[in-house]
Regions:
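Serine-hydrolase-like catalytic core of hydrolytic proteins
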Residues: 75-76, 80-257, 306-326, 356
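Non-catalytic accessory segments of hydrolases
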Residues: 1-168, 192, 283-285, 397-406, ...
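C-terminal domain-tail junction helix/linker
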Residues: 428-444
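Short, solvent-exposed turn/loop segments enriched in Gly/Ser/Thr/Pro and often Arg
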Residues: 145-148, 198-202, 362-371, 425-432
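Substrate-gating cap/lid region and adjacent catalytic-acid/histidine neighborhood
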Residues: 222, 230-235, 254, 258, ...
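Acidic/polar residues in short coil/turn loops that connect beta-strands
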Residues: 10, 173, 191, 293-294
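A structural signal for well-ordered alpha-helical segments within the folded catalytic domains
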Residues: 22, 88-91, 172-175, 179, ...
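Short glycine-biased active-site loop of nucleotidyltransferases that positions the nucleotide triphosphate
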Residues: 132, 212-216, 370-376, 429-431
Length: 444
């Protein structure tokens, strides 16, 4: 029977027993970033007395909910079982473990959700750890601060910090969660020396930020980029702290706050409303709450981090979907249809140029049934998490076979740094002489 109760650095925790695994839901990895802690880096959680009942998912960061009849509302957010209670008190993680004892040292998969840094949460209907547990991998999913809550930079905040920087709280949340996992996952049967960080869209951009940051040295064993990462993709934005502060000043002016004290007393729901208004009034600022180069979390731009060899020297797997670009109208208008795809290949070739192991690159081309959206941005998630049964879409035996193939590929990579099963080499690394890309689709 999988571990049901265990002791962390902060206290005893009890999970929910399932068939062959246990899920620990809503475990705090930081203090609630509320009140005076709004717009501050995360702090270690307080220790607790007794047994923490990890039987329900934590609240999610305040955000605008998708309309039920919108594309993504229908795709991922209709099931009430996966609804979201919103609160700034949102820094929680979830753990799915099949381990029967704390000394098993199973590989760990650390998932960061996407959503343009404005939406999303750790327990969306497409995320689940059951299939990974079946394959001997522990899955961790996290909530982190979003939008203004996660990225607001401002001269007031930079001065208050005492070190002349602000913003990036969302990524610092992710680092705090990663540190928590590094320090505590052994109690759940995990190997703290074998952690694969992976994410999709904004989650992928987060992963690329983490492997480019000096703050995560020796914490990440492997990384998977899904639909946004790579070299020269046209997506990752090199935002100087000064620009982030200017955007923050514009937002604060819109809010009417005359001081940090006032800014911190604005209700969370009002912040979300102001965020939406800010995007309408300043369309060019719609996706401006992103990581900034503060000479702490990031010391240079994303492409420079690659060319200068500042990224982690670890195994990488990365890819895109055939219709990813549909959610990036600015790239579509420029005709950059292959930007993300090419960026994945460019990343692997850059690794090779640095004298490192080239990456494994994939291209997901399955056009999902039910409409004409094709292999849309995030369509691979149902497959690589093994949650196709939760989707409203029609499926074929080929879809389930593809899902099994992808779950095997992902978990093989998490175990060994190679997506191939032991003794096989069907999926080859992408090199200058042989730029191999694994196409993921149903078998004809």
């Amino acid at each position: 029977m999988a571990i049901t109760e265990t002791k962390t650095k902060y206290g005893q925790v009890h999970g929910v027993q399932k068939d062959g695994y246990t899920v620990f839901r809503g475990v705090p990895y930081a203090k609630p970033p509320v009140g005076e802690k709004r717009f501050c880096p995360p702090e270690e959680p307080a220790c607790w007395e007794g047994v923490y009942k990890a039987d329900h998912f934590g609240c999610v960061c305040p955000q605008t909910e998708h309309e039920p009849d919108s594309f993504y509302g229908k795709e991922f957010y209709l099931d009430p079982e996966f609804g979201m209670n919103q609160s700034e008190d949102c820094l929680y993680l979830n753990i799915w473990t099949p381990a029967n004892a704390a000394d098993e040292k199973l590989p760990v998969a650390f998932w960061i959700h996407g959503g343009a840094f404005m939406h999303g949460f750790s327990h969306e209907s497409e995320f689940d750890g059951a299939a990974y547990c079946e394959r001997g991998v522990i899955l961790v999913t996290i909530n982190y601060r979003l939008g203004v809550f996660g990225f607001l930079a401002h001269p007031w905040l930079s001065e208050e910090s005492g070190v002349g920087r602000s913003g990036n709280y969302a990524i610092l949340d992710q680092i705090a969660a990663l540190k928590w996992v590094k320090e505590n996952i052994a109690a759940f049967g995990g190997d703290p020396e074998n952690i694969t960080v992976f994410g999709q869209s904004a989650g992928c951009m987060s992963v690329q930020t983490l492997v480019s940051s000096p703050l995560t040295e020796n914490w990440i064993s492997k990384a998977i980029f899904q639909s946004a990462g790579g070299y020269d993709t046209g997506l990752n934005r090199d935002m100087p702290l000064s620009e982030a502060e200017t955007i923050g000043q514009e937002f604060v002016e819109l809010s009417g706050a005359k001081s940090l004290e006032e800014l911190r007393t604005i209700p969370a729901e009002k912040i979300v409303e102001l965020q939406e208004e800010f995007g309408r009034v300043n369309p060019s600022r719609m996706l401006s709450f992103v990581p900034n180069i503060d000479n702490h979390l990031l010391t240079c731009g994303y492409n420079e981090a690659v060319t200068e060899g500042k990224i982690k020297n670890i195994p990488y797997m990365l890819g895109s979907t055939a219709d990813d670009i549909g959610v990036f109208p600015e790239m579509k208008e420029k005709g950059e249809h292959g930007g993300i795809y090419k960026g994945c290949i460019n990343w692997s070739l850059a690794l090779e140029k640095l004298g490192r192991k080239p990456a494994y690159v994939y291209y997901f081309t399955r056009a999902l049934l039910g409409d004409d959206a094709g292999a849309f941005h995030s369509s691979e998630l149902w497959y690589m998490f093994g949650t196709l049964g939760r989707s409203w879409r029609p499926k074929t035996e080929g879809d389930y076979a593809l899902s099994k193939e992808m779950m095997d590929d992902w978990t093989n990579f998490m175990k060994t740094g190679n997506p191939n099963a032991e003794g096989k080499d069907d999926w080859k690394p992408c090199t200058k002489d042989a730029p191999y890309v694994q196409v993921l689709d149903v078998r004809k």
